[in-house]
């Protein structure tokens, strides 16, 4: 599902532990790290997509987490030209994302990256909240900065 402007609706997931660190996942067979994220299917709400992607990518169920916050609007990034599939219709030029800040309620051993036949990640670790800004691929960096900045007060509220 791609919107009229060429952006694919998507959810981004920032999963935190009790000490405010965030889950940072390594893309399978690559030295590239990112937050879990995934597309929103037709007739699926962002929250429904969040829980589906959370299960597909890190093996967690709704009862394993608590939603702390969500970005107010859509945050967009454009794909580099080399990643745009110019012969696909409709043309997708980037992603528009709703970002969710979650607190892990269950034991971290519940995190599993191998529950689907096509896992996206093969490893993960806890990192400091702002660490991903210096590590994520450049074309996603501004969206990460905006999401982390908007959601940070909710993490610091420590409720």
From Swiss-Prot:
GO terms for molecular function: metal ion binding; pyrophosphatase activity. A motif (Nudix box) lies at residues 38-59. InterPro entries: Nudix_hydrolase, NUDIX_hydrolase-like_dom_sf, NUDIX_hydrolase_CS, NUDIX_hydrolase_dom, RppH. The keyword Hydrolase applies. CDD domains: NUDIX_Ap4A_hydrolase_plant_like. Gene3D superfamilies: Nucleoside Triphosphate Pyrophosphohydrolase. Its cofactor is a divalent metal cation. The keyword Nucleus does not apply. Residues 6-149 form the Nudix hydrolase domain. Keywords: Hydrolase, Metal-binding. Its EC number is 3.6.1.-. Belongs to the Nudix hydrolase family. RppH subfamily. NCBIfam families: PRK00714.1-1 (NF001934), PRK00714.1-4 (NF001937), PRK00714.1-5 (NF001938). Accelerates the degradation of transcripts by removing pyrophosphate from the 5'-end of triphosphorylated RNA, leading to a more labile monophosphorylated state that can stimulate subsequent ribonuclease cleavage. This is RNA pyrophosphohydrolase. The gene is rppH.
């Amino acid at each position: 599902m791609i919107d009229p402007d060429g952006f694919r609706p998507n959810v981004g997931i920032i999963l935190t532990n009790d000490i405010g660190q965030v889950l940072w996942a390594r893309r399978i067979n690559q030295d590239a790290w990112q937050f879990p994220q995934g597309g929103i299917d037709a007739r699926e709400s962002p929250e429904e997509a969040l829980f589906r992607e959370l299960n597909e990518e890190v093996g967690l169920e709704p009862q394993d987490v608590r939603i702390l916050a969500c970005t107010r609007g859509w945050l967009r990034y454009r794909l580099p030209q080399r990643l745009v599939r110019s012969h696909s219709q409709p043309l997708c030029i980037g992603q528009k994302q709703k970002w969710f800040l979650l607190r892990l309620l269950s034991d971290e051993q519940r995190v599993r990256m191998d529950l689907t036949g096509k896992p996206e990640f093969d490893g993960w670790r806890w990192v400091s909240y702002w660490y991903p800004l210096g590590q994520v691929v450049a074309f996603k960096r501004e969206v990460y900065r905006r999401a982390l900045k908007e959601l940070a007060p909710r993490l610091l509220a420590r409720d």
